[in-house]
């Protein structure tokens, strides 16, 4: 109740709904998260995938970078706060994230994709699906506001030939 954490040593049964909240406040998030080690410096809102070294990297659809997605290594979520290389980073696996500075102005209701390339050195979800031969297409979520997304990765990854 005071913002701390509670540990349940056994199975937890919830008989009511779990509410995820949307917030207009910059940097707010709610949902399912996990802590990983960053394989490079990451910024809030960037899409990530797990590399073979077990660390998370910027996920790109171009198939050539450390975090390049493919059918065996899809993007898993979005970073909720900036993180230095080789540090703990919180990844939103499913839920809502608001970010004014790093997100472009999204079209409400639009499907969002793993980006084909970084924009202004950021790897944030894009409105346009990748379209070049050798790229991979993966839905990462949906725009629910001009600067708020619902992260809900679809683990289906399609290669453009």
Q: Language model features by range: what are they?
A:
Residues 16-161:
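Glycine-anchored, exposed beta-strand/edge motif detector
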Residues 1-14:
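Beta-strand-rich receptor-binding modules of extracellular spikes/adhesins
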């Amino acid at each position: 109740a005071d913002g701390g954490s509670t540990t349940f040593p056994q199975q937890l049964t919830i008989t009511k709904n779990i509410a995820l909240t949307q917030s207009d406040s910059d940097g707010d998030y709610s949902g399912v998260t996990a802590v990983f080690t960053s394989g490079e410096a990451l910024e809030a809102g960037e899409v990530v995938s797990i590399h073979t070294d077990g660390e998370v990297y910027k996920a790109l659809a171009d198939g050539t970078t450390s975090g390049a997605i493919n059918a065996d290594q899809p993007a898993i979520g979005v970073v909720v706060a900036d993180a230095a290389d080789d540090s703990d980073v919180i990844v939103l696996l499913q839920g809502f994230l608001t970010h004014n500075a790093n997100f472009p102005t999204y079209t409400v209701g639009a499907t969002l994709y793993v980006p084909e390339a970084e924009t202004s050195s950021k790897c944030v979800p894009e409105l346009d699906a990748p379209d070049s031969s050798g790229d991979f297409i993966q839905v990462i979520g949906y725009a629910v506001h001009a600067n708020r997304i619902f992260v809900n990765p679809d683990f289906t990854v399609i290669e453009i030939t």
